[in-house]
């Protein structure tokens, strides 16, 4: 009988481990499973994944950090990514592929996380109530002429917290507070999600709402005759606020090199095409195709001056500000 040496056993174990990666993701399973399967087919590397709420997954990673069971954390919104990195849970990753494919304002300044798909937090109007060509901006929506015309999603959602963080980063705390206070004064109602905001706008309950683009895409795909249209805000100033879904390598991951290769693949043309198609988001790569629905919205000026790392850094101030003005 032949016996394997300890060195051979360790080498075999390391090789076996490299044949799989584990991802914790707050993205819905139907949005990522086919992307993971494509990678498995192309590389032979099995992608195991666990889904859940971003906060709960971050706590799981924190609890396991000395002996992590996960290699990659994937979630929505730079605020969640920043929180994970600020807790020391993500590794700084050196990769020419990632830094060349992911624009600087859509990744962590220390390369601990990278945006993988883009969504804009835009204004959507009822076309029967708002004239085409109306100048809309986040700041304009705080003015008296929009009183009783604005629908908002709850301030408890990270998407709005990051939007307000952007306003703080752009204008300073006091001016941002004045803007959000104006929103609250002008609001018709506060809704639990973006879809309900859109339905209220379509019904004429309000003239305008602030939502993520893919929610609009999903609804208009099902009901194309709704009197709704995207009206890109801030096109005469700094541009519409954009955010990301993204990912980073977990600190102490046992498969750092393989995890980096997977992240690089997620920023490739093939994966970017799938990201764009599955949820009507904008690909990070300009060479990756958009869906026909997304193309139909036309070009817009995005806010590229605001680094999304600051959306996380300013999140606590944003939450405090919204509480102070009564934005629930």
Locate predicted features.
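Early extracytoplasmic/lumenal segment of secretory-pathway proteins
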Residues: 18-82, 328
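Sec-dependent N-terminal signal peptides
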Residues: 3-12
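Mature extracytoplasmic/periplasmic domains
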Residues: 245-305
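A ligand-binding cleft/hinge motif common to bilobed small-molecule-binding domains
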Residues: 79-83, 202, 207-227
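Extracytoplasmic ligand-binding site segments that recognize negatively charged/polar headgroups
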Residues: 26, 30-33, 69-205, 238
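Extracellular/periplasmic bilobal clamshell ligand-binding domains
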Residues: 292-328
């Amino acid at each position: 009988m032949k016996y394997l040496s300890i060195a051979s056993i360790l080498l075999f174990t390391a090789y076996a481990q490299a044949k799989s990666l584990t991802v914790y993701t707050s993205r819905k399973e139907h949005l990522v499973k086919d992307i993971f399967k494509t990678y498995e087919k192309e590389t032979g590397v099995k992608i195991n994944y666990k889904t859940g709420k971003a906060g709960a997954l971050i706590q799981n990673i924190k609890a396991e950090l000395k002996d992590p069971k996960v290699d990659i954390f994937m979630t929505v919104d730079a605020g969640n990514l920043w929180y994970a990195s600020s807790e020391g849970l993500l590794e700084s990753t050196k990769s020419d592929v990632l830094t060349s494919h992911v624009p600087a304002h859509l990744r962590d300044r220390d390369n601990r996380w990278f945006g993988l798909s883009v969504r804009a937090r835009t204004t959507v109007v009822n076309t029967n109530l708002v004239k085409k060509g109306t100048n809309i901006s986040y700041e304009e929506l705080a003015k008296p002429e929009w009183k009783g015309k604005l629908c908002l999603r709850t301030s408890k959602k990270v998407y709005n917290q990051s939007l307000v963080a952007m306003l703080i980063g752009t204008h300073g705390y006091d001016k941002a507070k004045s803007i959000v206070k104006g929103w609250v004064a002008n609001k018709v109602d506060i809704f639990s999600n973006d879809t309900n905001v859109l339905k209220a706008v379509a019904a004429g309950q309000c003239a305008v709402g602030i939502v993520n683009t893919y929610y609009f895409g999903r609804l208009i795909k099902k009901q194309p005759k709704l009197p709704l249209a995207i009206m890109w805000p801030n096109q005469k100033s700094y541009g519409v606020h954009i955010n990301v879904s993204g990912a980073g390598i977990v600190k102490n991951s046992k498969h750092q090199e393989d995890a980096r290769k997977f992240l690089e693949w997620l920023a490739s043309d093939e994966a970017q095409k799938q990201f764009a198609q599955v949820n009507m988001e904008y690909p990070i790569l300009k060479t990756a195709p958009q869906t026909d629905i997304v193309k139909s919205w036309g070009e817009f000026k995005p806010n590229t001056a605001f680094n999304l790392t600051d959306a996380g850094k300013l999140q606590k101030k944003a939450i405090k500000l919204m509480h102070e003005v009564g934005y629930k």
